[in-house]
Amino acid sequence: MNSGYNPGNANHITSHSNRTKNGVPTIPQPALMASNAILTIGPYKHRKDLIRESVLTKYQIIGYIAAGTYGKVYKAKSKTNGNSNSNSALMNDNVISIGNGQKEAGLQKTNNESMEDKNQLFAIKKFKSDNHSNKNNHDINGNEVIHYTGISQSAIREMSLCRELSNKNITKVVDILLENKSIYMVFEYCEHDLLQIIQYHSHPDVKPIPDFTIKSITWQILNGVTFLHKNWIFHRDLKPANIMVSSSGVVKIGDLGLARKFNNPLQSLYTGDKVVVTIWYRAPELLLGARHYTPSIDLWAVGCILAELLSLRPIFKGEEAKIDMNNKKSVPFQKNQLQKIVEVLGTPTTKNWPTITKYPEYSAFQQHFSNTYPPNLISWYKLIGRTSKQCLNLLRCLLEYDPTIRITADDALTHAFFLELPKMSENSFEGLSQKYPKRRIYTHENDIVSNSQHVNNKRHGYDDNMTRKRQR
């Protein structure tokens, strides 16, 4: 039998009697095979590219909002009235929707629908490509060739987490697009963020944020954080610029680029990200070099945000010691930031933080903080003109040195502060006499497709020219 004969192949001649011609044996013909060109990925990718909708086909870019380390954000509106998002069904499948249980019954409901939803407005985040180019590397036509090394870890994290999470206090992703090696994440649009609101109340004149608004915003932040923690996720970058608020006063936690699952990590938290949380909102255990930490780092950040809502300025505004670019494996000791914390909360001791001696930077801490500072939080609270004892108690519970006894997000939701009048609402703006200005949009910089970089619009915190001493 000829070795090329395969009785299981229907394309071969299956009968021995048919393999002769005029009594002379013939050689079986091989099976019909697709050409290598058809089997390669190129034609398939080309066909997919032809049917894939582009970002400009689906969305009209209204203007440019801001830039950060991740990339750029644009305001846009749908060209299809929200009825044909390619990934909408994908976003609604396999979502986790726990965390809105009985505790939410205490929140006053409102009938105001978000105007952002009615007008189908979106925020489109364009991630920076993880690429590098060589000026001496050109094609045969003399055009510069850009080599792409892949998708950033931050983009992968945010995409994977946002597609699985569904909670009204977490910013919702409605679409993900890949075009020309750029990734676009499309989120529901929020007209405000806490940084913008704080700046409105502090400039040019100081106008304290009403207690009702602070209470409603804080409760909704804690509700979103509770949802994340119940799903084994910590945010790791909570700060005012990452807390969005819709025009109807609903809080949305955004920017999950540093968020991470903590129930079964593939590598240690420190190995993956040596520096997490913006310096002013970074928990003391992180400042002391903790290699392993817990979701309590998010609660410290919430405490810092609450204090900032109360006082209209960061409570611990330290200066960050930068990483030595020649030794990126070494994280510098953040003496100045710890100094700001100690001045308000007092010097931590083994009495109020028994495990402090276990942290890698404890010896450096002892060296720089030989003098003992007394607790000063009550004086700080009185100085800013606040009077609620329960609010002060919640703040103390959130800004607890020892992470093992720091209040959890779930317990904070039922703190006495939220039970006393005025009762909070899902509309944080309810009853306000003023309306907050809309987010600033740069309409002359709306080219979302180009790779040009915008500067001076980062939203990481206060610029020096945006802060001043509060009038006493």
UniProtKB/Swiss-Prot annotation:
PROSITE patterns the UniProt entry points to: PROTEIN_KINASE_DOM (PS50011), PROTEIN_KINASE_ST (PS00108)
Q: Which residues form a coiled coil?
A: none
CDD domains attached to this UniProt entry: STKc_CDK8_like (cd07842)
Q: According to its UniProt record, which residues of this chain constitute the active site? A: D237
Where is the Protein kinase domain positioned along the sequence? 59-418
Gene Ontology BP terms: negative regulation of filamentous growth; negative regulation of transcription by RNA polymerase II; nuclear-transcribed mRNA catabolic process, non-stop decay; positive regulation of transcription by RNA polymerase II; protein destabilization
Q: Where is the composition biased (Polar residues)?
A: 1-23
- Please list the residue ranges that the record marks as compositionally biased, kind Basic and acidic residues: 460-472
Q: Which reaction does it catalyse?
A: L-seryl-[protein] + ATP = O-phospho-L-seryl-[protein] + ADP + H(+); L-threonyl-[protein] + ATP = O-phospho-L-threonyl-[protein] + ADP + H(+); [DNA-directed RNA polymerase] + ATP = phospho-[DNA-directed RNA polymerase] + ADP + H(+)
Respond yes or no to whether keyword Zinc-finger is given for this record.
no
Primary location: nucleus
Q: What is its EC number?
A: 2.7.11.22, 2.7.11.23
Query: Which UniProt key words apply to this protein?
Result: Activator, ATP-binding, Kinase, Magnesium, Metal-binding, Nucleotide-binding, Nucleus, Repressor, Serine/threonine-protein kinase, Transcription, Transcription regulation, Transferase
- Residue ranges of region Disordered? 1-25, 450-472
User: Where is this gene product found?
Assistant: Nucleus
* Residues the record lists as binding ATP: I65, A66, A67, G68, T69, Y70, G71, K72, V73, K125
Q: What subunit structure does UniProt give?
A: Component of the SRB8-11 complex, a regulatory module of the Mediator complex.
Q: What is this protein called?
A: Serine/threonine-protein kinase SSN3
Q: Which gene encodes it?
A: SSN3
